[in-house]
C-alpha cells in the first residue's frame, strides 16, 4: 500500500508523526520544491532529507514512556519521589518540590500544559481522548525514557486507545486496598465516605477541574483490571501494602523490573539512601514546612500513609458494601 505525507520542515512533532508512518509501511514523502530551484533551495531540500534521516536514526533508540499508574491515593507520589531521589546525583539532597520536573511528569497525564501547548480543546473530553497518543508523541520528543504519572484507566474509547507499544515501554501499576483508598481519597477531595464510594463504584468516574473532564478513572475495579490486562507492554503490579510493610524488597523489585526493560542500574546502598530521604515521616515534615503543590482539600497531602486505617474509620455496613462491590478483585489481591 502507498500513503502520501507532506512535510513542513522545522516541525519536530510532524517529523515524529512521519517517522511513525514510515515505520508502519511503505511511504512516499513529498517535499514541495520551487519550479526553478536555486542553489539555496537545493541545499534546503538536502537539509530536510538529512534531518528526516537523523530523526529516523534517533527514533530507533527507544525513547518511550514508563507509566507510573494508579488509582488516586495509592502511593504514586511516594513512588515518584523515591525514583527521583534514586536517579539524581548521589551528592544531591532530595527536596519535596524536586518531583515538580518534566523528567517525572509530576503534573500527570493528560497534562493541561501539554494540551495547551498543542492547542487541543481541553474543554471537550472527546478532544482529549482523540489526542492521547499525540500528547505521548510530544512527551517522547526528548528522545529518552520518560517516567509519567497517570491516574487514567488503560482504556479504549471508540477507536482511540489510551496508549500503545509505539509510545509505551512499560509501566508500574500501584494497587491499594479499596477500603483504605476510600478513606484517603475522601479526605483528599473533601467528600463524605458514602459519596466517595459511589464515585469509586462508577464506570463513569472522572478526575476533573472545575470546568472540564481530564482523566477517566472508571471504578476502582475497572481501573485495576484495565492495567492488569494490558498486553502490549509488560506492566509490573505492586501492592501499596508491600511498599509499606516490606519496603526495601518491594523497591528492589521495582528497580529490577526497570533494569529489565530499560538500563537502570541496581545499587542497594542508593536504595537505602533514597528510602531514607523519602520516608513518610520526613515527607510529612517537609510538607508542613514547605507546602506541597499536590495537596487537595485535606490539611496535608501526606496525611497518614498507613495500611488498615479503614478499620478505625469505616462503619461495618460501609466496609461490607465495599467488599461486596469489589469482591472478585479483593480476593484476587489477598485483601479478603
Residue ranges and their predicted role:
Residues 1, 6-10, 24-27, 34-37:
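Intrinsically disordered, low-complexity segments enriched in small polar residues
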Residues 69, 232-257:
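Phosphate-binding beta-loop-alpha motif at adenosine-nucleotide cofactor sites
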Residues 87-89, 250-264:
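Non-catalytic, well-ordered alpha-helical segments in soluble enzyme domains
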Residues 276-298:
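Short acidic/His-enriched helical or mixed secondary-structure segments at domain edges of catalytic enzymes
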Residues 17, 26-31, 36, 42-45:
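Intrinsic low-complexity, disordered N-terminal segments enriched in polar/charged/small residues
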Amino acid at each position: 500500500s502507498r500513503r502520501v505525507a507532506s512535510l513542513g520542515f522545522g516541525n519536530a512533532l510532524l517529523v515524529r508523526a512521519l517517522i511513525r508512518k514510515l515505520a508502519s509501511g511503505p511511504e512516499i514523502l513529498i517535499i514541495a520544491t520551487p519550479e526553478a530551484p536555486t542553489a539555496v533551495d537545493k541545499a534546503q531540500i538536502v537539509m530536510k532529507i538529512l534531518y528526516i534521516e537523523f530523526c529516523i536514526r534517533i527514533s530507533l533508540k527507544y525513547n518511550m514512556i514508563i507509566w507510573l499508574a494508579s488509582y488516586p491515593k495509592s502511593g504514586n507520589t511516594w513512588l515518584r519521589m523515591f525514583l527521583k531521589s534514586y536517579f539524581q546525583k548521589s551528592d544531591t539532597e532530595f527536596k519535596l518540590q524536586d518531583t515538580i520536573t518534566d523528567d517525572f511528569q509530576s503534573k500527570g497525564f493528560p497534562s493541561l500544559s501539554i494540551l495547551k501547548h498543542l492547542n487541543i480543546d481541553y474543554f471537550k473530553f472527546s478532544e482529549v481522548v482523540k489526542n492521547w497518543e499525540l500528547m505521548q508523541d510530544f512527551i517522547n520528543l526528548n528522545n529518552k525514557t520518560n517516567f509519567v504519572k497517570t491516574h487514567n484507566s488503560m482504556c479504549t474509547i471508540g477507536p482511540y486507545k489510551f496508549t500503545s507499544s509505539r509510545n509505551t515501554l512499560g509501566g508500574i501499576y500501584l494497587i491499594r486496598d479499596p477500603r483504605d483508598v476510600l478513606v484517603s481519597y475522601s479526605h483528599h477531595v473533601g467528600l463524605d465516605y458514602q459519596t466517595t464510594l459511589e464515585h469509586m463504584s462508577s464506570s463513569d468516574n472522572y478526575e476533573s477541574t472545575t470546568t472540564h473532564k481530564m482523566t477517566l478513572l472508571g471504578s476502582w475495579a475497572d481501573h485495576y483490571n484495565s492495567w492488569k490486562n494490558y498486553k502490549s507492554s509488560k506492566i509490573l503490579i505492586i501492592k501499596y501494602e508491600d511498599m509499606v510493610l516490606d519496603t526495601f524488597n518491594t523497591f528492589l523489585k521495582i528497580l529490577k523490573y526497570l533494569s529489565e526493560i530499560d538500563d537502570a542500574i541496581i545499587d542497594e546502598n542508593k536504595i537505602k539512601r533514597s528510602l531514607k530521604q523519602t520516608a513518610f515521616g520526613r515527607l510529612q515534615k517537609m510538607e508542613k514546612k514547605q507546602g506541597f503543590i499536590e495537596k487537595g482539600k485535606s490539611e496535608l497531602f501526606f496525611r497518614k500513609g498507613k495500611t488498615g486505617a479503614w478499620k478505625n474509620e469505616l462503619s461495618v455496613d460501609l466496609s461490607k458494601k465495599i467488599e461486596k462491590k469489589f469482591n472478585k478483585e479483593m480476593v484476587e489481591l489477598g485483601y479478603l
